[in-house]
From Swiss-Prot:
Name of this chain's protein: Putative 3-methyladenine DNA glycosylase
Provenance organism: Nitrobacter winogradskyi (strain ATCC 25391 / DSM 10237 / CIP 104748 / NCIMB 11846 / Nb-255)
Enzyme class: hydrolase
UniProt entry keywords in alphabetical sequence: DNA damage, DNA repair, Hydrolase
Enzyme Commission identifier(s): 3.2.2.-
Classification of source organism: Bacteria, Pseudomonadati, Pseudomonadota, Alphaproteobacteria, Hyphomicrobiales
HAMAP family, per database record: 3MGH (MF_00527)
A Gene Ontology molecular function term of the record: DNA binding
PANTHER family per UniProt: DNA-3-METHYLADENINE GLYCOSYLASE
Any GO BP annotation: base-excision repair
Family designation: Belongs to the DNA glycosylase MPG family.
Amino acid sequence: MKLTQDLTSDGPDPPVLGKPLTRAFFGRSVHDVAPDLIGATLLVDGVGGIIVEVEAYHHTEPAAHSHRGPTPRNMVMFGPPGFAYVYRSYGIHWCVNFVCEMDGSAAAVLIRALQPTHGIPAMRRRRGLHEERLLCSGPGRLCQALGISIAHNALPLDAPPIAVFRRTEKADVVAGVRIGITKAADLPWRYGLKGSKFLSKPFRSAGY
């Protein structure tokens, strides 16, 4: 499957060709995991798509939830890699992160956007709209489309209902500053698939 090809929601879902990612994949530096996730496939109960945009966060910088230390809300970030960290943003939208690095490192990758490939009818029902480009183009949108909530917090990424599959072809990854933050706003820790129409926001340096 070409990462930038247009897909239709008619007919059966395409097969997932990549191998499931193990917890060892997420045990690496968050700055290696984040770009390597571009082109991977995220499914929750069989609904999801290709990851096209992410952001990296680490406890050493003030934009991270873990910067001030562990709390009941962010405790999952301080645990072992390969687990989901789910929180509510502005009291409205759920956001899903993948915990990375060694136990106690408090690093995670925020999943910002997907290219829908699986369970698109279910996504449309949950989102209340038809346009595929808008179904998962943002962290809150994709959580609504995939049915992700606090019930998924602290769940492993390598066991049902969550599955993450390795990309099967090289991805053309671009980088830029993160979105919607005021601290450490100059760090180029946002990564995306160049040319994707499913991004939450274009990359200024990407020329499109």
